[in-house]
């Protein structure tokens, strides 16, 4: 399935039904009073969060959503039927913005959570409401009001507690496959991961923790280079960052600094989020190299530093122990 995490759509609530002009016409009431009913409410457009959905792909094909109009009032003071609501399912993690004002309308994170994005219009009043001592037979009624109309921007931010970050080909997908049941595409070249992957890693207690394998970031990601904005958005909700650095790289310390600079430039508190620095691919490096790089990194960061291998699974148990400790602290 294609992963789409951005969409722009149009929503419109239904128009309220018109009130009507009517009078009582019973056989034995020759001068019946006003009896025009009110119009019904227009339906509303309502978003419903669904944990079974993983993408905004459907909004590439359906961009306009309109609820039903309310029915006009009836004689004998009968109120018209309300218009049917338009229910639109979205993935959990969807943020909804007013496209024109940039106002945040809602953040749908819980399964079943709802958000009214375009309210239906109120039904018009029938002529019975205009009866007065001065006017015993009002011959006018009010039309229903138009429903709300909006253009929306939808952004999907993955709901994961741990975000795995690093430069392309740092081994993020291999690590994800080793830690969880996720089976991301893996190959020995940069940019294998073009969309975020989610995986659930089980604690010893049996509880699951969601990890997100974020596509490789590059220098300039905070400016949108290499789809950086789209990728960085998905780690905004994480509680912990697992920063993978390829120890076999020509300059692992510089690789670490590049990602840190991108987090700082993007803002939103990402650079201050708790981190674990994992020097990956220890199966292809010696202990002396590890200690040398670790020593340099300790001058740049107070985060825990550990050597691991996603291929041989070296150090993964120790890594997870640190993850659980930081999440529980």
Curated annotation (Swiss-Prot):
Cellular compartment(s): Cytoplasm
Residues bound to Mg(2+): 173, 193
Binding site for GTP: 166-173, 191-195, 213-216, 280-283, 309-311
Main location: cytoplasm
The protein's enzyme class: hydrolase
Alphabetized UniProt keyword annotations: Cytoplasm, GTP-binding, Hydrolase, Magnesium, Metal-binding, Nucleotide-binding
Residue intervals of the Obg domain: 1-159
Biological process per Gene Ontology, one example term: ribosome biogenesis
The protein's Enzyme Commission number: 3.6.5.-
SUPFAM superfamilies found in the cross-reference section: Obg GTP-binding protein N-terminal domain, P-loop containing nucleoside triphosphate hydrolases
GO molecular function, one term: GTPase activity
Keyword Magnesium attached: yes
Cofactor(s) needed by this chain: Mg(2+)
InterPro entries found in the cross-reference section: G_OBG, GTP-bd, GTP-bd_Obg/CgtA, GTP1-OBG_CS, GTP1_OBG_dom, GTP1_OBG_dom_sf, OBG_GTPase, P-loop_NTPase
Gene Ontology CC: cytoplasm
OBG-type G domain residues: 160-328
Keyword GTP-binding among record annotations: yes
Family: Belongs to the TRAFAC class OBG-HflX-like GTPase superfamily. OBG GTPase family.
Described function: An essential GTPase which binds GTP, GDP and possibly (p)ppGpp with moderate affinity, with high nucleotide exchange rates and a fairly low GTP hydrolysis rate. Plays a role in control of the cell cycle, stress response, ribosome biogenesis and in those bacteria that undergo differentiation, in morphogenesis control.
Subunit: Monomer.
Protein name per its UniProtKB record: GTPase Obg
Organism ancestry: Bacteria, Bacillati, Cyanobacteriota, Cyanophyceae, Oscillatoriophycideae
